[in-house]
């Protein structure tokens, strides 16, 4: 009896591996086919809006705000860590 059960488990594992590879390969092939298809006109139409968004993000005012935001939480974190370290040293 043990031999037929083993065979069935093997066949199941094989079918699983096949299904995974099969599901992965056609998706990749489709992506490759899409990249080769000429859709240049649509891309050109999209690009100016993206550029405008990037410009608005990288203005001096927004950059300054970002710097302030990024610097303040870092300072708080480092201060908290220092306090913890100091407490540990005192205990020793």
Curated annotation (Swiss-Prot):
One of its GO terms (molecular function) is DNA binding. Its main location: nucleus. It is found in: Nucleus; Chromosome. Residues 7-19, 29-92 have a biased composition (Basic residues). GO terms for biological process: cell differentiation; spermatogenesis. Sperm. The keyword Signal does not apply. GO terms for cellular component: nucleosome; nucleus. This is Sperm-specific protein Phi-1. The lineage of its organism: Eukaryota, Metazoa, Spiralia, Lophotrochozoa, Mollusca.
